[in-house]
Amino acid sequence: MGNILTCCVHPSVSLEFDQQQGSVCPSESEIYEAGAGDRMAGAPMAAAVQPAEVTVEVGEDLHMHHIRDQEMPEALEFSLSANPEASTIFQRNSQTDALEFNPSANPEASTIFQRNSQTDVVEIRRSNCTNHVSTERFSQQYSSCSTIFLDDSTASQHYLTMTIISVTLEIPHHITQRDADRSLSIPDEQLHSFAVSTVHITKNRNGGGSLNNYSSSIPSTPSTSQEDPQFSVPPTANTPTPVCKRSMRWSNLFTSEKGSHPDKERKAPENHADTIGSGRAIPIKQGMLLKRSGKWLKTWKKKYVTLCSNGVLTYYSSLGDYMKNIHKKEIDLRTSTIKVPGKWPSLATSACAPISSSKSNGLSKDMDTGLGDSICFSPSISSTTSPKLNPPPSPHANKKKHLKKKSTNNFMIVSATGQTWHFEATTYEERDAWVQAIQSQILASLQSCESSKSKSQLTSQSEAMALQSIQNMRGNAHCVDYETQNPKWASLNLGVLMCIECSGIHRSLGTRLSRVRSLELDDWPVELRKVMSSIGNDLANSIWEGSSQGQTKPSVKSTREEKERWIRSKYEEKLFLAPLPCTELSLGQHLLRATADEDLQTAILLLAHGSREEVNETCGEGDGCTALHLACRKGNVVLAQLLIWYGVDVMARDAHGNTALTYARQASSQECINVLLQYGCPDECV
């Protein structure tokens, strides 16, 4: 087996070899020479080189000797080549003990140690270590390592001592030369920290090969960076070799964009945070609700709903759409109302006891039932109510109750145009919270809104005069339901003016009973202005309060609950509605006669009492005309509009196949034509 001699040298310490220490590495078959390198290179240390332990393993008769620089024979003083590709070749000489060297003058030459009698090169081993030269000032940040492989045949030769001495002396010389002229290149040098305090090499003077205690240290290599700080570091060259395996070097050319721009990534969230939610109203309530689609499937889908202080309810397909402010739909609450299926509003659910005639502001009306009992028309019925008012349970009662339970968490928003949005919450507490928030916002938005269209902005002077004429009608100086002055809101189908507080209650009734509009905020086409100018508060109250004797209307000091109870009893329950005139005609036939005579007051009374079937009654089998046909034949847009609001069929044809639009064209009434086309009457001229 072979033997290994390993030496680690630091320029600032002396070199000594301890006697008979080492480790065997039979796989190594070449000489490694390592030059100085700087720590900044960061190359990993080779596994074969262990700087913390300097070993010498030789044969039994082999001894190591050290020669001081002062004692170095003149025959050993040589200079290294300045060529970076230079190598040191050691060859054995079996014929002579003298070590002779012959450095070439050519820069491409190498330092050659060869024997006197043998000229052929038996074996060449070149080092494959990279020289890393620091660009900073040198301050003892490098070391040099050399490993000498000794096989059995070499260890038995007597000239081995001179070979080891030459190699040992060559190590610091190479370090000195390399640092001095920056020309010696030792590729792929593995840099490591120096951990050996001193290394001693002893030499026996007698040549017998015995070791003694005479030792000295090799002088430290001077720091060339301090001597010549202005030198430039040339790029080092790599010496290829098939023996040693190079370490893989990774390029920084293809670094990820994410890692190459840390500042941009750090600043990106700050810039993004500055733009979130800019220009949008802050929601006062928001969350996920189920919304029923308007298609025939009637499917429920999750929507992210927001309620803002500007009086707008907005729903999005998802929370992400809300964050991006896309795919949204808005509901203007100023022209809408909210309803809960199967439930009265909370303001109208107070109990009502039997009210005597002495009650100044009662809403119940004493009616003869044949038993002398009084009926309370409040949602809750007193315990003193006659048993006649408690009908036997219906066989469908349980079914209706079950249907109500299924929709306990639902609520709907109805616009002035009749459009409906159905929403559902997860719990009834959440539903009530949404209903209360929307109701409060409707009232707040109506109270805080200012007129966006002044009288000077009207399209013509005639429109301003028409709106002024509406306010100048009898009874329109105060609210139709109680004595609030200067009302600014109107109910189209009732033809009345009201205050803003009553307008909120009228919205809760639904568009079937009251269609609320603002005199200042909404547009007023000709047909609507004519309806309002034809009815007024006095005419309307003569019909809707025709039987309110003994009942006192709410005052300005009345609570909202009292006002709402009065309004619902007046329009929804029709407790104070004037009675029908005594006639042998049915209500439908009476309506046809009133329409033909253009008796507006009688027509309004009949419409208030009538049902949808009675409103659509025809003159007879031979004619087949409805009240709408008669109104359009007269060109009376007020009656035509009222009939449409109360449920007349605009698609109906008479016995001759004519629609109401045909009669409107015959009467040359453009106003009736516009109304009929607006509500979907078929146009046969198209």
From Swiss-Prot:
Q: Which PROSITE patterns match?
A: ANK_REP_REGION, ANK_REPEAT, ARFGAP, PH_DOMAIN
Q: Where is the composition biased (Low complexity)?
A: 211-225
Classification via Pfam families: Ank_2, ArfGap
Domain Arf-GAP per the UniProt entry, residue ranges = 464-584
Q: Where is this region: Disordered?
A: 205-242, 256-278, 382-404
Repeats (ANK): which ranges? 623-652, 656-685
List where Polar residues composition bias occurs.
226-241
Q: Which Gene3D superfamilies match?
A: Ankyrin repeat-containing domain, Arf GTPase activating protein, Pleckstrin-homology domain (PH domain)/Phosphotyrosine-binding domain (PTB)
Q: Does the keyword Zinc apply?
A: yes
Q: Which ranges carry the PH domain?
A: 282-443
The C4-type zinc finger ranges are 479-502
UniProt GO MF annotations: GTPase activator activity; GTPase activity; zinc ion binding
Bias (Basic and acidic residues) occurs at 258-273
| Keywords attached to this entry | ANK repeat, GTPase activation, Metal-binding, Repeat, Zinc, Zinc-finger
Coiled-coil region(s) at which residues?
A: none
The protein's matches in InterPro entries, at most eight in alphabetical order, are given as: Ankyrin_rpt (IPR002110), Ankyrin_rpt-contain_sf (IPR036770), Arf-GAP_GTPase_ANK_PH (IPR051282), ARFGAP/RecO (IPR037278), ArfGAP_dom (IPR001164), ArfGAP_dom_sf (IPR038508), PH-like_dom_sf (IPR011993), PH_domain (IPR001849)
Q: Does the keyword DNA damage apply?
A: no
The source's superkingdom equals Eukaryota
Q: What else is known?
A: Encoded by one of the numerous copies of centaurin gamma-like genes clustered in the q11 region of chromosome 10.
**PANTHER family associated with the record:** ARF-GAP WITH GTPASE, ANK REPEAT AND PH DOMAIN-CONTAINING PROTEIN 4-RELATED, CENTAURIN-GAMMA-1A
The function of this protein is: Putative GTPase-activating protein.
Which family is annotated?
Belongs to the centaurin gamma-like family.
Protein known as: Arf-GAP with GTPase, ANK repeat and PH domain-containing protein 5
**Organism this protein belongs to:** Homo sapiens (Human)
As recorded in Swiss-Prot or TrEMBL, the protein's gene is named: AGAP5
